[in-house]
């Protein structure tokens, strides 16, 4: 269905109004035939009056619209997650084999964390109203949320590890140069003596 979520929700509200109208008209019609209100209410679901038939049709339309809304939300969520996953993969593919600057590490992991946080937000938004979702759909959303949350925390840990590793390499390089200069200076002093 190409309708937007707002259009589907508008149709749902109109269908609810139709259900209520047809139900009340059917009850009224059955009561004018001599049924008690309780009998009339019970008879609406299987009666042959035009209002009973319209009521059942509106009920089915309502269920179909709820299915359309659920399908729309699931498809939209899937598309958003897929887009973010593709961006994460592109970012991962552009990651250098070896870091040169701390600012490169910070930039990479800031971008990665932003994309992962966006994934978490998409899952959280999808889980705000699960009343029309199946248990399997809810489980998939919760699993996705858990994976994205774990990946977000791992990105923060990896950023710290990569920064620490680069700083250690830079420190080792500085110590090596200092020792090299110290040896050269000692050789020069020995040559002067």
Residue positions per predicted region:
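Residue positions that define the register of long amphipathic alpha-helical repeats
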Residues: 1-193
């Amino acid at each position: 269905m190409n309708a937007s979520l707002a259009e589907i929700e508008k149709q749902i509200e109109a269908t609810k109004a139709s259900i209520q109208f047809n139900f009340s008209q059917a009850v009224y019609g059955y009561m004018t035939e001599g049924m008690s209100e309780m009998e009339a209410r019970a008879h609406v679901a299987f009666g042959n009056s035009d209002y009973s038939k319209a009521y059942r049709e509106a009920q089915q339309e309502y269920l179909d619209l709820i299915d359309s809304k659920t399908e729309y939300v699931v498809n939209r969520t899937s598309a958003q997650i897929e887009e973010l996953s593709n961006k994460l993969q592109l970012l991962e593919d552009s990651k250098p084999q070896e870091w040169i600057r701390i600012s490169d590490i910070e930039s990479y992991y800031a971008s990665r964390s932003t994309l992962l946080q966006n994934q978490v937000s998409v899952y959280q938004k999808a889980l705000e109203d699960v009343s029309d979702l199946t248990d399997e759909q809810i489980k998939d959303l919760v699993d996705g949320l858990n994976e994205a949350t774990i990946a977000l925390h791992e990105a923060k840990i990896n950023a710290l590890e990569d920064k620490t590793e680069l700083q250690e390499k830079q420190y080792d390089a500085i110590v090596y140069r200092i020792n090299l200069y110290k040896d050269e200076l000692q050789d020069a002093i020995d040559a002067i003596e």
